[in-house]
Amino acid sequence: MNRMKHLLCFLLVATLGSLSFKANAYTERNMLQKAADEATLKNVLVMKQAWVPYPAYTDRAAWDSLMGPNKQRLIAAGEKLLDYKWKLIPATAYLEYERSGNRKVMEAPYDANRQALNALMLAELAEGKGRFIDQLLNGAYMSCEMNSWVLSAHLPRQSSKRSLPDFREQIIDLGSGGYGALMAWVHYFFRKPFDKINPVVSLQIRKAIKERILDPYMNAVSYTHLRAHETGAYL
């Protein structure tokens, strides 16, 4: 009988200890909320994209000054791409990485498209006459139609462990980060010209950046250490 009482006491203490541990483990600390109040945040945050160090697309005098002697060179580079055929990356190009280890078959058209989009953006910023807008629209639209901006060599980090993009899961790598940044700049500078043609393209760009970059970065457990570092939580 005594042994039974001792056993019950032991189990009771163990259970209470476990509950206490769980309560402490899941206590909300809210470090960021305690670090600053609303008034402090209003003084610290830079709103309405005032942090952008570049002039508006329509400020031609500023862009002429910024481009300087490079203006004509950038325009000429864009002119070579006015008839550029945006390259489709087939499923087999992604699969080639897991079949043979060859990543270039996917990266070659991927890099060509991204470089073309970048060159067209710089050309339009340099000239400002709208000649490159349609091709920029084509490139941005094509980019939004891709299932992923991640390189095939990095896609095995998906839950599927395969090198073909899985629409059910978005991950981030250096390639997708760079592509997302480029798309963000294209949207920032040319949203109004795009909207005059069709506002759907700007909506697609924002949707693609949110789903492929912002959401996985903010929600994935694997990026917690980066978010903590950037928000100062380690302090």
Predicted segments, located by residue:
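Bacterial Sec-dependent N-terminal signal peptides
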Residues: 1-27
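Short, solvent-exposed loop/edge-beta patches enriched in aromatic
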Residues: 86, 102, 109-136, 144
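Well-ordered alpha-helical scaffold segments within catalytic/enzyme domains
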Residues: 115-130, 178-197, 233
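Long, well-ordered core segments of solenoidal/helical folds
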Residues: 78-89, 136-154, 201-223
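Acidic/His metal-coordination segments adjacent to aromatic residues that form catalytic metal sites
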Residues: 98-102, 152-169
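Low-complexity, Ser/Thr/Pro/Gly-enriched N-terminal "stalk/linker" regions
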Residues: 26-98
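Short, solvent-exposed segments of well-ordered alpha helices
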Residues: 100-111, 166-174, 232
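Conserved small/polar residues in nucleotide/adenosyl-binding loops
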Residues: 224-231
